[in-house]
């Protein structure tokens, strides 16, 4: 897996985290326990820090990047759907960022929120806790019920299990045969 230091900053990845073999992690990136970065994911901490909490999952082909000195923070139990783009944003614990959603610079997502698939969260936008935000640009559509917001935690837990299964299934090149 491509893991690169940048200007003296090295990625720090917890031993229990799983990084797909073709994910790329660069620079000032910290990834917490039981978190995962799936196939094609890119975390570029080259111009500022990226902090990924515990039990987070960054799904296939998602990109996380930052501007100078502005961090990108994912608190614990955050799910980032396939092909999402996060740019120096702060995502609260237990939130779900839908597939192909874009979170622009300095946006803040409150804990337990759902950012709908394809949504575009504007630069500097603040999405309150337990909100459903959708659209281009994203607007808060409604507050989520507590049980809806709580459902994102087991979703993140399922990805902990899936990452462990992926890790166990990896083959060395010597184990792959071609006809």
PLM features per residue range, with description:
Residues 1-37:
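N-terminal segments that cap or nucleate solenoid repeat domains
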Residues 1-12, 46-54, 60-62, 66-67, ...:
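Glycine-rich hexapeptide-repeat left-handed beta-helix
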Residues 21, 33, 39, 54, ...:
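A cytosolic small-molecule/anion-sensing beta-strand core signal
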């Amino acid at each position: 897996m491509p893991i690169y230091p940048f200007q003296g900053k090295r990625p720090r990845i917890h031993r229990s985290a799983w990084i797909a073999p073709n994910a790329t992690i660069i620079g000032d990136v910290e990834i917490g326990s039981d978190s995962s970065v799936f196939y094609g994911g890119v975390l570029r901490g080259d111009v500022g820090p990226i902090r990924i909490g515990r039990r987070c999952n960054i799904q296939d082909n998602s990109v996380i990047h930052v501007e100078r000195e502005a961090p990108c923070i994912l608190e614990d139990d955050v799910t980032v759907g396939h092909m999402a783009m996060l740019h120096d944003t702060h995502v609260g614990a237990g939130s779900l960022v839908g597939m192909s959603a874009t979170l622009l610079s300095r946006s803040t997502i409150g804990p337990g929120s759902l950012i709908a698939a394809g949504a575009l969260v504007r630069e500097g936008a603040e999405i309150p806790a337990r909100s459903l935000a959708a659209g281009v640009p994203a607007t808060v559509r409604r507050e989520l019920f507590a049980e809806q917001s709580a459902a994102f935690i087991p979703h993140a837990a399922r990805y902990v299990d899936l990452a462990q299964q992926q890790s166990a299934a990896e083959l060395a090149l010597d184990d792959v045969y071609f006809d």
